[in-house]
């Protein structure tokens, strides 16, 4: 993800970058080493994630360009950014899609880029969305334990147990939206033109098939 972002933002001038759903800040810390003039802002709805990000930030030699804030993006207000990055978040955000897309466009400067990872609108993902809705309707502790057992087998040696426990919740969350022609048209109507796409490898059969899409803010279509 870092290299994709670096391939679509200028490195030789001061830019503002926002990471929506930044978690503990790992992507921004890696970008900071390659974007020496950038101001890097991370927001996450989890105060625990932001606390961890700020702890990592305090341990770094140079932290002036890194900012972290616990915030819901739909209520977040700031000066426009040159780039917005969101990895596996937009498809989970509740609410009306058009309003979300318009906010993304409004938070970008002219010529700014949006780098987003989302599941594709395809039959495989649609099937898993149905499964997740069904699981959510019958969720109980035994099912959580069974999902965790399966995850341990699938990710044996790849992920620690705490990380696997955190991911159990995602098996009950169907996507609110998926990237396809209809959603791309919604982005275009808000002035965000699709510029590039990069497929991503799934880490398990239960993961939605997804990719990275790059949008550039231009003129709003009539």
What are these regions (language model features)?
Residues 76-84:
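A short acidic, Gly/Pro-enriched loop at the edge of an enzyme's catalytic core
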Residues 98-110:
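A short glycine-rich, Lys/Arg-flanked "PGG" loop and its adjoining helix->strand segment in the class I
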Residues 173-190:
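Short alpha-helix
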Residues 26-74:
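Class I SAM-dependent methyltransferase SAM/SAH-binding core
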Residues 21-25:
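Class I SAM-dependent methyltransferase "Motif I" SAM/SAH-binding loop
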Residues 1-13:
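Conserved alpha-helix/loop element of class I SAM-dependent methyltransferases that forms part
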Residues 115-146:
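Conserved class I S-adenosyl-L-methionine
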Residues 83-96:
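A short SAM/SAH-binding and catalytic strip from SAM-dependent methyltransferases
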């Amino acid at each position: 993800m870092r290299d994709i972002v670096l391939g679509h933002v200028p490195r030789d001038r001061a830019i503002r970058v926002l990471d929506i759903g930044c978690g503990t800040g790992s992507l921004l810390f890696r970008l900071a080493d390659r974007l020496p003039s950038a101001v890097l802002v991370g927001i996450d709805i989890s105060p625990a994630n932001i606390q961890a990000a700020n702890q990592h930030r305090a341990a770094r030699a140079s932290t002036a360009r890194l900012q972290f804030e616990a915030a819901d993006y739909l209520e977040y207000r700031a000066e426009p950014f040159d780039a917005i990055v969101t990895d596996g978040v937009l498809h989970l955000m509740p609410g009306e899609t058009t309003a979300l897309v318009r906010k993304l466009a409004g938070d970008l400067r002219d010529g700014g880029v949006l780098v987003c990872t989302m599941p594709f609108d395809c039959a495989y993902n649609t099937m898993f969305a149905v499964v997740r809705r069904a699981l959510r309707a019958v969720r109980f502790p035994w099912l959580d334990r069974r999902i965790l057992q399966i995850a341990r087998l699938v990710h044996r040696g790849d992920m620690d147990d705490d990380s696997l426990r955190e991911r159990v919740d995602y098996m009950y969350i169907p996507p609110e939206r998926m990237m396809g022609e209809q959603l791309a048209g919604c982005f275009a109507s808000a002035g965000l033109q699709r510029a590039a796409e990069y497929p991503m490898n799934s880490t398990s059969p239960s993961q939605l098939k997804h990719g990275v899409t790059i949008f550039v803010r231009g003129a709003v279509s009539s």
